[in-house]
Design a protein with these regions (language model features):
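Short, Lys/Arg-rich, polar N-terminal cytosolic tail immediately upstream
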Residues: 1-10
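Membrane-helix interface and helix-disruption motif detector
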Residues: 34-51, 72, 144-145
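Alpha-helical membrane-embedded segments
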Residues: 140-168
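Membrane-cytosol interface motif
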Residues: 176-192
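Juxtamembrane/interface segments at transmembrane-helix termini
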Residues: 94-104, 163-179
Length: 194
């Protein structure tokens, strides 16, 4: 028997559902400060912290819920983290477009636009043609350059969402078959008999 802990790759339906719902629950209110940070931070390089933080928040929320649901499969943790982060990206786009259209309002109902993805896509394409993002106060970036910036932002958000979900599931060992409570795990991951 190996003296190091290895995940059992156990999957439970309630764990996957709890992870997804927790990620969605973190994504909706988290989109508002994320978009506020993107709009408010004047330094373009510091804006990169926003998608990292938002993605990590959504992924960590998923991972904690999956730990509660006894998910020990890292692949499933990554898939649920990716799906929740993708939802978070969509919600952030809805909030961002609404703030672009109504800059004086920070409290609004995003559901109407969120339920119309074709309309949202048309607005995104039109926004790309006009440009909204500039580097050091220059002319707003448009076209391929802006698509690449948005793609990088999406990659950071999705990547850190997946990594945080996997890290949360991976960090916590669970003795699934140990109902007697005689096995405990030390900080090094070794099994200690009591």
């Amino acid at each position: 028997m190996s003296q190091l802990y290895r995940h059992s790759n156990k999957i439970t339906l309630q764990g996957a559902v709890a992870g997804m719902l927790s990620g969605i629950a973190a994504a909706m209110p988290g989109a508002f400060p994320y978009v506020y940070g993107i709009w408010s931070i004047p330094e373009a390089k510091l804006r990169g912290v926003c998608p990292l933080t938002y993605g990590a928040l959504v992924g960590a929320s998923c991972g904690i819920a999956m730990c509660w649901g006894k998910i020990r499969n890292l692949t499933l943790a990554g898939v649920v983290g990716f799906a929740s982060s993708l939802f978070a990206l969509y919600v952030s786009w809805v909030i961002w477009i609404l703030h672009l259209m109504f800059p004086s309002f920070w409290i609004f109902n995003p559901i109407r636009l969120a339920l119309q993805p074709k309309v949202l896509w048309k607005i995104v394409v039109a926004t790309n043609a006009q440009g909204t993002w500039s580097f050091k106060g220059s002319v707003p970036m448009t076209g391929t350059g802006l698509w690449l910036v948005w793609l990088g932002e999406a990659g950071l958000l999705l990547g850190f969402g997946v990594l945080a979900a996997i890290a949360m599931v991976k960090r916590r060992p669970l003795a699934v078959n140990d109902v007697s409570g005689l096995l405990h795990f030390s900080l090094e991951g070794r099994i200690v008999r009591c």
